[in-house]
């Protein structure tokens, strides 16, 4: 029975079905939540900097495809090669978002999980005029920004835009990144923080300073997003507190 379940989970038809259902559910969430934008002119602020690097926290990224509100907002999103990532990739493609497969990690795992190839592909995508969206923290180190995204900004010359999207209704899982599954029929907020530019000759000390600034900014915009939907510090409270109600 275990082998049968494993075969089904890995089958292309099952993964496509899950991707379709996930995309349909996310559309429902986006269309049935009353979204506000902070600042109100966030797109007018960031558009002159496009193509840009959109930074989110792990576990707070399910609505990332909807940062694209115009055709000029071409976006590719970084998604891991893990089996769970396959579902996310298929859902993103259903939502007409390009994908780059690979993930950030530590030490040799960076090579094994396709980090080097993904880094080069992200630089190329930015050169081709695509915005790139990715999580700033790497697996098992929730809410700690890695240097990878800072290196991407230095290499590409593009600006980092820290973003957070929250809904008043959600499920929060008991895992390392406190994954938040956004739910329909509530309020939503998209919050942008102060943009970060990395000079091409940035020293290691400056890189660390900018990494810490990105981390602080992402925490700030995430807190603001949840406060605006009436769920102050929703994802940063104790894990596993169930559903948030709008």
Residue spans for each PLM region:
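Catalytic-site beta-strand/loop segments enriched in glycine and acidic/polar residues
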Residues: 115-156
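A cross-family acyltransferase "interaction/gating" segment
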Residues: 144-204
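Solvent-exposed loop/turn segments at secondary-structure junctions
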Residues: 61, 139-141, 168
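Short glycine-enriched loops at secondary-structure junctions
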Residues: 57-61, 81-84, 185
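Generic beta-sheet signal
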Residues: 78, 102, 135, 162-165
């Amino acid at each position: 029975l275990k082998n049968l379940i494993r075969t089904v989970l890995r089958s292309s038809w099952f993964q496509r079905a899950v991707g379709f259902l996930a995309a349909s559910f996310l559309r429902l969430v986006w269309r049935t939540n009353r979204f506000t934008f902070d600042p109100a002119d966030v797109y007018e602020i960031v558009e002159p900097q496009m193509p840009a690097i959109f930074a989110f926290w792990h576990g707070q990224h399910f609505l990332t495809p909807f940062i694209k509100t115009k055709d000029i907002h071409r976006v590719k999103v970084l998604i891991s090669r893990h089996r769970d990532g396959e579902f996310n990739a298929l859902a993103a493609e259903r939502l007409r978002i390009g994908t780059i497969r690979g993930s950030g990690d530590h030490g040799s795992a960076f090579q094994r999980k396709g980090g080097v190839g993904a880094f080069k592909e992200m630089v190329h995508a930015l050169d081709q005029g695509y915005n790139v969206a990715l999580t700033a923290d790497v697996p098992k180190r929730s809410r700690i920004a890695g240097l990878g995204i800072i290196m991407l900004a230095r290499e590409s010359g593009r600006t980092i835009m820290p973003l957070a999207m929250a809904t008043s209704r959600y499920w929060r899982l008991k895992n390392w990144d406190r994954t938040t599954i956004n739910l329909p029929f509530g309020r939503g907020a998209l919050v942008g923080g102060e943009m970060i530019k990395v000079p091409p000759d940035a020293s290691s000390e400056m890189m660390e300073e900018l990494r810490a600034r990105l981390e602080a900014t992402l925490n700030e915009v995430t807190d603001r997003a949840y406060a605006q939907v009436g769920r102050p510090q929703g994802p940063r409270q104790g894990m596993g507190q169930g559903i948030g109600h709008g």
